Amino acid sequence: THLVLPAKNDSKLVAAASKSSFAKLLDAGIHIHEFHGGLLHSKTLTIDRNLALIGSANLDRRSLDLNFELNMLVYDTEFASELRFLQSSYIEQSTSVDAGTVSSWSIQKRLWQNAIGLISPIL
């Protein structure tokens, strides 16, 4: 499983909140990539080469209830293949984040990220 996030976020708080989960995600076997080609807002997921989820909504109350964002589930092999190709291109334009990278962050940086992570539900 791969997670692609923008290397530069338009919000320092959102970036810190995201990074507060990196160690747990890496421990769970998730491959994290920081995309250098610009800001990514779309959320995409491909499953079993024939199912695709695409949209703008985060899976949180704010996106679903307040912002009225949507995702679309598509059962189509060709669509899923094209989306998978796009996802691969994002990974090619990214830098991988590994456990060594996360453990090299300073105590101050990790404290900041974890403190912001506590308020992530309201960001």
Where in this protein do the model-derived segments appear?
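PLD/PLD-like phosphodiesterase catalytic module centered on the HKD motif
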Residues: 1-123
